[in-house]
């Protein structure tokens, strides 16, 4: 076992900067004790005194998360002792639901902790995008959280800061408990007296300074389950004082939509008397986890879209030919599913459970606004632009200081092919799934593995099929053939966004966002996805921007393929360079057009008022596009494309 270093006391400075400026981090970081060198990669986020970066082991090429704490933030002895204790507790842990800590070292400037990389961020970002999740998803996440808590408690460790933001997700959406800054060990019946935690999750015995132990983690898990199911903390209010009062008086309400097993478990975990709360082992065995089906895996799409828990469709309504156009309507309840007997076997329980989960998924979708968040996004951008936004003298340095990479969109369009003169627009999402928005307002989407197909009628009724099941109705043959042609063309003639992937467990539950509305101007193509993301690709300099109303953030992909993500309120507070500000002003106009002129766009998407007809056949300036004479034989020469997949 490697020795824990004693954190050296940093030199005192006469003028310490109060602002949380990014630490000075060398491009090559040396762990001299182990002879290991790390290359600093992209910025991952910040919290407290720490900034996190992707670090690549120079020898093995293994990528880890590097937590960097400037020594200037560790001036006092208690600060250094606290960090040493955090590492001492965390480094001995080894469990699938605990973030793995690899090493701990320092140089003259910083202290470094290398950790398991959790590429899908945390449950906090899931919450911001989804608010409430379905009960099967809540079982999936909560059961893993409890498994991790049980492991800690068996080692006499209390986490003491269990919350959505400390529950991280890897690429397989496995929950990983992290941030052991407040963790402590207890012996026997010892009760801790420290007032610590996060307001919405603090147990009453902590507030009352009555002494606390393992039960505070159970209380926090109760709060987490409540948030997952109902979209907000049980004791949240407009003021901290009122929140604490509600916690002390156990003043909360379980919504009537809750199932009995869920409500029962929440009440047990939020019992004001700590000794009456269940242990982690008892929670693990609670009937809630057996009261309905629980997925063994979830698709990445659940970070932004409700999964499809229903079966595949077996019959369809006949469709009439509609005018060419794009969909300007909202996603509606998923009332187009087939019988529940077609559910994947790894999530099947009994009929009542399946029906309830299906209804919950439909209810979750119904809560989406009819305009797919367009008015919400317009308001956010308008408020930003109404304020006096500070200028930036050193643009690049300032921008790097307040990025919010946790707000990066889950999905964006990486390729597109416009053939709306005849069929519609084809596109590829960043995960390599492919879709088409047809001129009759119907939509089709094929997952990255080429197995799971979704068809959405112009009425927004959804149907699901397996490409290899033989159950595809003949009515869809032409559209599936066109989808394959679009897919083949983008793979063969546009710069690849990545290789295809094999299907993984849980992918059969995926509901992917689809292109809802689009149009082209002389300057850009404007795309609106069904999950609320608005994307604008500028033709002249190939800069792209994606705006998410749920995260209240904007992501730019610049000419150098760098992805830069900022919260809108940070741009207002800290400043926005002109190179981005004028694009936000343009975006406001385009969002307004998406809201007010969708009916005009739907009549003829290939001939916009400000775009000459010849533009419909012109190719945008993309390094990944080829000339018309090189087009695939099954796609006409008027197809155009633009590749925006960034190199990270």
From Swiss-Prot:
Residues 1-24 are annotated as: Disordered. One of its GO terms (cellular component) is condensed chromosome. It catalyses: L-seryl-[protein] + ATP = O-phospho-L-seryl-[protein] + ADP + H(+); L-threonyl-[protein] + ATP = O-phospho-L-threonyl-[protein] + ADP + H(+). GO terms for molecular function: ATP binding; protein serine kinase activity; protein serine/threonine kinase activity. Disruption phenotype: Impaired protein polarity. Lengthened AB and P1 cell cycle times. RNAi-mediated knockdown causes defects in germline mitosis including cell-cylce arrest and formation of polyploid nuclei. RNAi-mediated knockdown in plk-2 mutant background causes a loss in sun-1 phosphorylation at 'Ser-8' but not at 'Ser-12'. SUPFAM superfamilies: Polo-box domain (SSF82615), Protein kinase-like (PK-like) (SSF56112). Required for oocyte nuclear envelope breakdown before entry of oocyte into spermatheca. In meiotic cells, required for spindle dynamics and probably for spindle attachment to the chromosomes. Zygotic role in the development of the germline and nerve cord. In mitotic cells, plays a role in spindle organization and centrosome maturation. Involved in asymmetric nuclear localization of cdc-25.1 during embryogenesis which affects cell division timing. Together with plk-2, regulates cytoplasm polarity in early embryos. May play a minor role in chromosome pairing and synapsis during oocyte meiosis I. Belongs to the protein kinase superfamily. Ser/Thr protein kinase family. CDC5/Polo subfamily. This is Serine/threonine-protein kinase plk-1. It comes from Caenorhabditis elegans. The lineage of its organism: Eukaryota, Metazoa, Ecdysozoa, Nematoda, Chromadorea. The gene is plk-1.
């Amino acid at each position: 076992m490697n020795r824990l270093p004693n954190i050296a006391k940093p030199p005192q400075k006469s003028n310490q900067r109060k602002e949380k400026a990014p630490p000075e981090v060398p491009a090559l970081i040396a762990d001299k004790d182990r002879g290991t060198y790390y290359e600093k990669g992209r910025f991952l986020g910040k919290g407290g005194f720490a900034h996190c970066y992707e670090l690549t082991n120079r020898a093995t090429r293994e990528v880890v998360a590097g937590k960097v704490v400037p020594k200037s933030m560790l001036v006092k002895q208690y600060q250094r002792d606290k960090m040493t204790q955090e590492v001492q507790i965390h480094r001995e842990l080894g469990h699938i639901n605990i973030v793995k800590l690899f090493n701990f070292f320092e140089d003259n400037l910083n202290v470094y902790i290398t950790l398991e990389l959790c590429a899908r961020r945390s449950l906090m970002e899931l919450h911001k995008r989804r608010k409430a999740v379905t009960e099967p998803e809540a079982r999936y996440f909560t059961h893993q959280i409890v498994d991790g808590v049980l492991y800690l408690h068996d080692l006499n460790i209390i986490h003491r800061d269990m919350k959505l933001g400390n529950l991280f997700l890897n690429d397989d959406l496995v929950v990983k408990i992290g941030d052991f800054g407040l963790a402590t060990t207890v012996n026997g019946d010892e009760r801790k007296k420290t007032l610590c935690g996060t307001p919405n999750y603090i147990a009453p015995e902590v507030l009352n300074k009555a002494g606390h132990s393992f039960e505070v983690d159970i209380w926090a898990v109760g709060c987490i389950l409540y948030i997952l199911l109902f979209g907000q903390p049980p004791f949240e209010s407009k003021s901290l004082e009122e929140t604490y009062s509600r916690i002390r008086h156990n003043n909360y309400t379980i919504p009537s939509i809750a199932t009995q097993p869920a409500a029962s478990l929440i009440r047990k975990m939020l019992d004001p008397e700590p000794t009456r709360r269940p242990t982690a082992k008892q929670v693990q065995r609670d009937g809630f986890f057996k009261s309905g089906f629980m997925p063994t895996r979830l698709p990445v799409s659940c970070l932004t879209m409700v999964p499809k828990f229903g079966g595949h469709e077996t019959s369809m309504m006949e469709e009439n030919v509609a005018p060419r156009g794009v969909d300007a309507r909202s996603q509606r309840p998923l009332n187009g599913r087939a019988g529940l007997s077609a559910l994947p076997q790894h999530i099947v329980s009994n009929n009542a459970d399946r029906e309830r989960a299906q209804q919950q998924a439909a209810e979750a979708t119904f809560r989406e606004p009819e305009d797919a968040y367009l008015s919400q996004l317009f308001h956010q951008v308008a408020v930003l632009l109404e304020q006096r936004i500070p200028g930036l003298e050193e643009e690049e340095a300032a921008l790097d200081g307040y990025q919010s990479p946790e707000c990066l969109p889950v999905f964006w369009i990486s390729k597109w092919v416009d053939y709306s003169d005849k069929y519609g627009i084809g596109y590829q999402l960043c995960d390599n799934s492919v879709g088409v928005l047809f001129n009759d307002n119907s939509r089709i989407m094929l997952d990255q593995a080429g197995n799971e197909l979704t068809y959405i009628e112009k009425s927004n009724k959804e149907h699901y099929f397996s490409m290899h099941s033989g159950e595809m109705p003949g009515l869809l043959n032409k559209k599936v053939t066109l989808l394959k042609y679009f897919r083949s063309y983008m793979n063969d003639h546009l710069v690849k966004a990545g290789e295809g992937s094999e299907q993984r467990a849980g992918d059969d539950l995926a509901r992917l966002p689809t292109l809802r509305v689009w149009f082209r101007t002389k300057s850009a193509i404007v795309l609106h996805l069904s999950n609320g993301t608005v994307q604008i690709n500028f033709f002249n300099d190939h800069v792209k921007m994606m705006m998410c109303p749920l995260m209240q953030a904007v992501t730019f992909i610049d000419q150098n393929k760098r992805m830069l993500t900022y919260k809108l309120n940070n741009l207002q507070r800290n400043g926005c360079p002109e190179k981005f500000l004028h694009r936000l002003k343009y975006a406001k106009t385009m969002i307004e057009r998406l809201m007010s002129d969708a009916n005009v766009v739907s009549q003829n998407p290939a001939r916009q008022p400000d775009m000459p007809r010849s533009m419909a056949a012109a190719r945008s300036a993309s390094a990944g596009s080829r000339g018309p004479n090189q087009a695939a034989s099954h796609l006409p020469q008027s197809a155009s494309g633009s590749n925006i997949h960034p190199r990270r």
